[in-house]
Amino acid sequence: MSSKTLAKFLEENLEDLKSKGLYNVIDPLESSNGPIITIGGKEYINLSSNNYLGLATDSRLQEAAIGAIHKYGVGAGAVRTINGTLDLHIKLEETIAKFKHTEAAIAYQSGFNCNMAAISAVMDKNDAILSDELNHASIIDGSRLSKAKIIVYKHSDMEDLRQKAIAAKESGLYNKLMVITDGVFSMDGDVAKLPEIVEIAEELDLMTYVDDAHGSGVLGKGAGTVKHFGLSDKVDFQIGTLSKAIGVIGGYVAGKQNLIDWLKVRSRPFLFSTALTPADAAACMRSIEILMESTELHDRLWENGRYLKQGLKELGFNIGESETPITPCIIGDEVLTQEFSKRLNEEGVYAKSIVFPTVAKGTGRVRNMPTAAHTKEMLDEAILKYEKVGKEMGII
C-alpha cells in the first residue's frame, strides 16, 4: 500500500500549481531539436532551444559518436576512478583545457553536476560564498551543499559585492572566500562584469568562479566570457556545459592543474557516477575542435541574433538590455505573457514563456534563442508572427 501522506502532498501541490497556471506541460519533440521542430505532427519555427550553433545535429559530430560506439561500446562501464576512464575522456579534457586556455580540465556528466561537484569540493562550513542574486539554480544548490555561508549580492552591483566582501573578510569568521557569477545570465542575456569582479577578488583574495554555460561558444570567439575579457589566467574556476553551444551533453571545470587534481579525488559526482558515454565524449571533442578551427558558426549566431533583435525592436517590443544573442521579449504581466506565448505557438512559432518565480514578478517574458542554424527566411517569418500576435493582443 502506498503512502497516504505522499498521495495527499502530491495531489494538493499539483492542483495548486495547475490552479495558478504554473504547471508546466512538456511537449515531446518528434524531430531533432533544430531550427524547425515537429510537435504533434505540426512544424514550428523553434526559438526555444539552447542549441546555439546547430551542432546537436551536425553530421561531423554524428560520425564521431558512431565511430566511438563501434570502438568502445555504448557505455563507459564504470566510474572514472575505477576503470571507466577511457583514453577518449583524457583527450576530451585536454581539448577542453586548450579551448579554455587553462592548464587542465575535468569532464562531468552534466553542467549541473559541475556546480554540485566543484563548490563543495573546495568550500565548507568555515567558508563564505559571495553569489550574484541571479545565479543559476545549480550554483545555488551547489553552494548550499557545501554548507558555506552564502552571501548574496545585488545583480551585477559591484559596489554591493565590494562592501559585502570587505565585511566578510574583516569579520574574521571565514577561512576562505569565493565569488561566484554566471558569465552570461540566461534570462536577460546580460554579461557579468568580470574585469571588476576580478579586480575586487585580487584586492581581497577571493577565489573566482565563473559558470559560463551560456557564454562558451558564444563570446570570446567561442572560447567564452573569460576569454572575451582576456582573463583566462585570472579566474580560478571556469565552469561550462557541453550541452548548449557544444551541442551534446556533459559539463566541465577548467583551471590550474592542482585544482583539477583535487577535484579528481574530492568531487563526489566524479567519484560516484559512471563516466560520460564514449559517444558523448567523442562528439563533444569533435564539436570543440570545430569551434577552434573556425568562427563561422559563432559569427552566424551573432548575425542572426542582431537580425532578430532589430526586427523585434523596430516593431516596438521591449527586448531589454541583452548583450548576447539571447533575446527576451518582455511582456510584464504573467497571464498576458503566457497567453502571448500560446498565440505564437498557434501561429507556428515555438517560443516559451518565462514567468514568476523563474523571473521577478511583473517581468514575464518570452525568451527567444536564435541559433546559427536559422535562416533569414525563418527569422522573417517569426518576426511577422510576432507583429501579428503583438498587435492583436495590444502589446505593440
Swiss-Prot record:
Matches recorded under PANTHER family: CLASS II AMINOTRANSFERASE/8-AMINO-7-OXONONANOATE SYNTHASE, LD36009P
EC nos: 2.3.1.-
Residues the entry annotates as binding pyridoxal 5'-phosphate: 111-112, 186, 211-214, 241-244
Keyword rRNA-binding: no
Binding annotation for substrate: 136, 358
UniProt similarity note: Belongs to the class-II pyridoxal-phosphate-dependent aminotransferase family.
Cofactor: pyridoxal 5'-phosphate
GO biological process: biosynthetic process
Entry protein name: Putative pyridoxal phosphate-dependent acyltransferase
Superkingdom of origin: Bacteria
Keyword tags: Pyridoxal phosphate, Transferase
Pfam families: Aminotran_1_2 (PF00155)
Subunit and partners: Homodimer.
Keyword Signal: no
